[in-house]
């Protein structure tokens, strides 16, 4: 879940039903099979969200109706021609779980030469980002309202992304829920395969335990290398959200991790 809206659904991170398959940017996809991480089905059980109800405002609904046909790319089991979708060839960045979209819009506005694919399942967030796209006249964002794991599998070609952002995914802070976190070895391997050599993966979290897990998992992937000794300074392009600023005032930490895909040789 992106910190644009720390709890847009009204459900705290771990207060959702324990049987729920996942979270707004994390977790394990239930299939009815045994929970065996060595199984080839394990990656398919990873899901990037848990279904939560959320009210779509009048303005968000209007943005969906008016701007959705241009800026929302329907999920498909085939890879679109992204150059055609954006109307140009430019560096392409994937953001998984953009929340209410404020950070996504701000980054896109400051990086007009890059194109951004935002993946979010929750309709209020989709509507909120579309509203910002309209207000700020942004042309370099497209949205897919679907599970990020399936989007990666079917809609993003290997070695095609110049960057990926995963900001403040749900931490699932209870130990019994850690298996639901998004940043797990199978998912990271899948995402890394979609990055071009030299492309970056930027994760951020305000949960130290999750930051430690991210550092371990990302560091163990043989195709990735850390750009820092451990945690990275916050890159200038990532905005500090109101929620994050409040946490920092209260003494809470925020950890950024920036890895790059290794080049051949």
From Swiss-Prot:
Low complexity bias locations: 18-31
Pathway: tRNA modification; N(7)-methylguanine-tRNA biosynthesis
Keyword check for Protein transport: no
Gene3D superfamilies assigned: Vaccinia Virus protein VP39 (3.40.50.150)
MF annotations from Gene Ontology: tRNA (guanine(46)-N7)-methyltransferase activity
EC number: 2.1.1.33
Record field: compositional bias (Basic and acidic residues): 1-16
Pfam families with a match to the protein in the record: Methyltransf_4
Record key words, sorted: Methyltransferase, S-adenosyl-L-methionine, Transferase, tRNA processing
CDD domains the record matches: AdoMet_MTases
Keyword Membrane set for record: no
Binding site for substrate: 174, 206, 241-244
Region (Disordered): 1-40
Catalytic function, reaction form: guanosine(46) in tRNA + S-adenosyl-L-methionine = N(7)-methylguanosine(46) in tRNA + S-adenosyl-L-homocysteine
Family: Belongs to the class I-like SAM-binding methyltransferase superfamily. TrmB family.
Function: Catalyzes the formation of N(7)-methylguanine at position 46 (m7G46) in tRNA.
Name recorded for this polypeptide: tRNA (guanine-N(7)-)-methyltransferase
Organism, as annotated: Burkholderia thailandensis (strain ATCC 700388 / DSM 13276 / CCUG 48851 / CIP 106301 / E264)
Lineage of origin: Bacteria, Pseudomonadati, Pseudomonadota, Betaproteobacteria, Burkholderiales
GN (gene name): trmB
